[in-house]
Amino acid sequence: MTLPPSLRSVEVDGAQPYTISIAPGLLADGARLARHVRGRHVLLLSDTQVAPHYAAGVRAALLQARPDLQLGELVIAAGEASKTLDNFSLAITALAELGATRDACVFALGGGVVGDLAGFAAACWMRGVDCVQLPTSLLAMVDSSVGGKTAVDIPQGKNLVGAFHPPRAVIADTDTLRTLPTRELRAGLAEVIKYGAIGDPLFFQWLHAERRALLDGDPAALAQAIARSCEHKADIVARDPLEKGERALLNLGHTFGHAIETEQGYGAPGNDNLNHGEAVAVGMVLAARLSAALGMADAQDTEALRTLLHEFGLPTQIPTGLAPEALLGRMRLDKKNIAGRLRLVLWRGIGKAEVVPDVDEAAVLEILAD
């Protein structure tokens, strides 16, 4: 088999190891896609933004490599508002109507919403079938497709119903980034910046130096950013697959960010609410400011993080109209909390983060109100 000329691979070790493949043209590689299908039943799950560009090609590539496949398809509306129990039920129904057996495979073709929903359906159908992640957004390539965290949202909060279900493979075709809207590219770069902020000062500096190339969608710069981000996440996930300890560090900014997303209403095509990456960007600044207020981080490092996010065109302030008390109420439902006490990922400066139990709510409220 001939390998793509620029293929990068990242191995995720653990009880269920898998490979992240990163290169252009991978969605057309039917043999690569089909090798992960153990049986004959495949459900291709996508959304209304991605499916028109790529679903037919993926279907054709799979059937060319495996003409015996029985292939079903489910397309949901694009946007975080689709990550619901209702759409989860549609995915389960699609698997049932397909006659999917325990050797079936769900292909998640899309961004983080599709990946989370498809992964959760795969985790639950017959107590677990294979899922292959085909991320088409930068955010999904560097974060949500890797690590096996799957979930849907409910009105009370984000990702509150889900399961750990590692994918059989992650296949990231970087050609899909060519059709990614600029706002979505920047949202993904927020998660990329997070990796530098929590564990890699040199990567943080590289991102500053390469910011123009990354924002312009330079393929080489993006491939390097994706591979480095995946390496960071793979290292942590291998040591802590079920988020019992250090994996929580990957959530820098997420407790604040999820509260913003839930309180304002989820970002989606047609509204101006912050999307996930934008909310995480604001959340990282809030976490850094709280860390500085608690004497954990230097104000100069906090400003360096805020500046870098701003240079990438990302928001750094809470949207107007969100009450601090309401945001704190959302934060109290965060999955990292223990015994009803806030447990936050805070910052020690560029390249250092830690989980802090029992954070003073008054200090958090002061940051939210400032």
Curated annotation (Swiss-Prot):
Task: Give the catalysed reaction(s), semicolon-separated.
Answer: 7-phospho-2-dehydro-3-deoxy-D-arabino-heptonate = 3-dehydroquinate + phosphate
Q: What are the names of the required cofactors? A: NAD(+); Co(2+); Zn(2+)
Looking up CDD domains in the UniProt record yields: DHQS
Binding residues for NAD(+): G112, V113, V114, G115, D116, T136, S137, K149, K158, T176, L177, R178, T179
BP GO annotations: amino acid biosynthetic process; aromatic amino acid family biosynthetic process; chorismate biosynthetic process
Cellular compartments annotated:
Cytoplasm
Record's protein name: 3-dehydroquinate synthase
Classification from the root reads: Bacteria, Pseudomonadati, Pseudomonadota, Gammaproteobacteria, Lysobacterales
